């Protein structure tokens, strides 16, 4: 795209989210700004991908048993050795988010293996070299050394705002003149969760929608 100008009009942030209003000035080649705004909005809310845990399997073994056999448990299991209710532990894993350093696959696997008692954090998860966790948070606490937990995680790339970190996208259209050049302005209001900045989302939108823009 040529003759594209992006300005920050407004920025706001808190502990859990970011909001930025961008002023995007385009040359007159792109006459249908309503369609352009829709392309951006639909991509950010529906097609922009994010990495999430698709499947998780928890295996436990009692270290004081004669044979160290692991058996499968679910979110409704009662484990006295874990301080938190196991259903809450299950939910914490669901909320973990990952980021690719470079794209290799649509599916990845990660593992968490506990040794001894104490607090277990997301930084203890072993992930592929091209993935990183977006935050370190407490997962659960083992109150004894008698239980070993082995967690296998399947991580998938999924489309849509529940997974990619985009919370809200709105846009306003405006026409203006500057000298002999007619500019069309698109104001794009993007709100994202703490692990994704609106600027990152916008740049990814420009990169992925280039084919759609070239046909306008």
Curated annotation (Swiss-Prot):
One of its GO terms (biological process) is DNA-templated transcription. GO terms for molecular function: DNA-directed RNA polymerase activity; protein dimerization activity. Belongs to the RNA polymerase alpha chain family. DNA-dependent RNA polymerase catalyzes the transcription of DNA into RNA using the four ribonucleoside triphosphates as substrates. It catalyses: RNA(n) + a ribonucleoside 5'-triphosphate = RNA(n+1) + diphosphate. In plastids the minimal PEP RNA polymerase catalytic core is composed of four subunits: alpha, beta, beta', and beta''. When a (nuclear-encoded) sigma factor is associated with the core the holoenzyme is formed, which can initiate transcription. It is found in: Plastid, Chloroplast. It comes from Euglena granulata. GO terms for cellular component: chloroplast; DNA-directed RNA polymerase complex; mitochondrion. SUPFAM superfamilies: Insert subdomain of RNA polymerase alpha subunit, RBP11-like subunits of RNA polymerase. This is DNA-directed RNA polymerase subunit alpha. InterPro entries: RBP11-like (IPR036603), RNApol_insert_sf (IPR036643). The keyword Iron does not apply. It comes from the Eukaryota.
